[in-house]
Amino acid sequence: TTQGFAIYGRYAFSMHDKGQCVIIDLKRNRLVNTFILDGNTGHCNNASFGVERYSRKSQFPLFYVTECRGERACYVNDITTEGARLVQKIFYDGEEITGPCDWAVDAARKRIYLYCTIGSLRWLKWFPLPQLADSDDKGEVHLQAEDALGSIPAGDIAIPQGSHIYKDVIFLMMQNLVQQLSQPR
C-alpha cells in the first residue's frame, strides 16, 4: 500500500514500505518505473519535494522521504525517473522524543516539519529547511531543539502518514474521515 505520495509536474511518486518508489506519468496515465530508494529501509510515511536541486542537471528538486522506524530520519534523495541517490539525512536530536517521527516539507515556505511523540502527546515542530551545504562530513544534518522556529501540540493525530504541507496549511488524510465520506447517505 502507499504510505507517502508526492507529485511534481506530470509525475506522481508513490512510496511504499522499505523504500519502494513507484512513478506514474499522470499525463500519459501509465507506469514509468519502480525501484528501491538508496538506503531507505523504513516505512516511507511521507514524501515531499523541496526547492533545492542536487545539481543543475537534476531532473527534479530534492525528494524528502520519512524513515519512521529505525533512525527516525528524513532521507533526502536526488531522484530521477530511473532511480534515486541518497544525498543527505536529517535527524532531530532532541532527547524528549519517545516514539516514531514523520517529516514533511513545505517547499513554498522552505520549512521542514517534524511530527513526533513527546510523552503521550503528538507534537508538530518546524525548522528552516536545511540545504545540502548544511550537511556534516557524513552527509547528515542534526537539528536541535533550539533550531525550531515553533512547535504546537498536534492533538489526536495518530498517524501523520500521507501529510502534505503548503504555505502553513497541513493536509492530512484521516482514515475515519475517508470512511465517513464513503458511506452512502
Language-model features: locations:
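A short beta-strand motif characteristic of beta-propeller blades
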Residues: 1, 30-38, 85-94, 139-154
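Structural signature of eukaryotic scaffold interfaces centered on beta-propeller domains
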Residues: 1-8, 43-60, 95-113, 156-168
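Short beta-strand elements that form the blades of beta-propeller/WD-repeat-like
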Residues: 8-16, 56-68, 109-119, 168-175
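Beta-propeller domains
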Residues: 8-40, 180-182
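Structural motif
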Residues: 18-23, 70-78, 119-130, 178-185
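Short loop/turn segments that connect beta-strands within beta-propeller blades
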Residues: 26-29, 79-83, 129-133
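Blade-loop segments of beta-propeller domains
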Residues: 28-68
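Loop/turn-rich, solvent-exposed surfaces of beta-rich toroidal or solenoidal domains
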Residues: 153-184
